[in-house]
Regions:
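Active-site catalytic microenvironments for nucleophilic, acid-base chemistry
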Residues: 104, 138, 158-165
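Acidic two-metal-ion nuclease catalytic site recognized across multiple nuclease folds
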Residues: 161-245
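Conserved non-catalytic scaffold segment of RNase H-like nuclease domains
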Residues: 1-111, 118, 125-145, 172, ...
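Short secondary-structure capping/turn micro-motifs that flank functional sites
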Residues: 75, 152-153, 214
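Residue-level "edge-of-site" marker
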Residues: 72, 149, 211
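Acidic, divalent-metal-coordinating active-site segment for phosphoryl/phosphodiester hydrolysis
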Residues: 150-158
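Short Asp/Glu-rich motifs
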Residues: 78, 155, 217
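Generic structural signal for hydrophobic core residues of well-folded globular domains
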Residues: 120-123, 162
């Protein structure tokens, strides 16, 4: 089977306002029974002009300048082609990357997604922060690239490593979450003052429907999220939560 590891570099951290300026993808084959990565099949990396100046603070992180992206556009047909025969898109913090790429390339909305940040029990396996650079360092890698293709390759290497407690590749628990039902939770009518709390929880703002939402996997996660919303966001107010399978 084939999956794809995806990473983006963007103009900023607001998925409602910012734009993708670099899209990186690594397609790989794996054994679904063991979670073993077999081989890399294809690699994609292209830059795109966002149509406005990249903020200096963002350039300082990924070192992609206005001159590097000037006049460039990512090939939509090439993106669609590389997704052919791919079962799942994996991103480290998919809650950020997914809305950005779905907005730019609607083909991603029809794909199944997995998040290596939240769908792998890193803390239970003895790791601290689940940020990619920390996980890589804990596994003996020193990676400071902050470029899309390099981050994809680094994540794939991390997914191929065995978790210390399970003694299985990190890819395997990620695959297990895909067998659970996926739900999009909408925090309809959430109070304005809770926006930072929602964003920190992994919710993303949709300017089109003017609502915060996030994806969760499984009935347990769904129930937990609804309880959290009612207690922390609505806090005794009438709750306006919508769930979409």
């Amino acid at each position: 089977m084939r999956e794809i590891v995806l990473d983006t570099e963007t103009t900023g951290m607001d998925s409602a306002q910012d734009r993708v300026i670099e899209l990186g993808m690594v397609v790989f084959e794996f054994d679904p029974a063991s979670g073993t990565v077999v081989r890399v099949v294809d690699v994609f990396d292209e830059l795109e002009d966002p149509g406005f100046a990249i903020p200096p603070a963002t350039i300082a992180i990924h070192h992609i300048t206005d001159d590097m992206v000037s006049g460039r556009q990512i090939d939509d047909a090439a993106v669609a082609h590389i997704l052919k025969d791919v079962a799942v898109v994996i991103a480290h913090n998919a809650a950020f990357d997914r809305p950005l790429v779905e907005q730019r390339w609607p083909v991603f909305a029809d794909m199944d997604w997995a998040c290596s940040f939240k769908d792998i029990p890193w803390r239970e396996e003895g790791f601290g922060p689940a940020k990619l650079e920390f996980l890589l360092h804990a596994n003996g890698f020193f990676h400071e690239a902050h470029r899309a293709e390099a981050d994809c390759r680094a994540l794939l290497e991390l997914l191929s490593r065995h978790l210390p407690e399970r003694q299985q590749p990190a890819l395997l628990p990620l695959l297990e979450t895909l067998n659970q039902p996926q739900y999009r939770i909408y925090a309809t009518g959430s109070p304005f003052e809770t926006k930072d709390m929602l964003k920190a929880r992994g919710y993303r703002w949709s300017a089109e429907i003017r609502c915060w939402s996030r994806m969760v996997a499984g009935e347990e996660a769904r129930a937990e999220e609804l309880t959290w919303l009612k207690r922390r966001v609505y806090a005794g107010r009438p709750a306006h939560v919508e769930v979409e399978p």
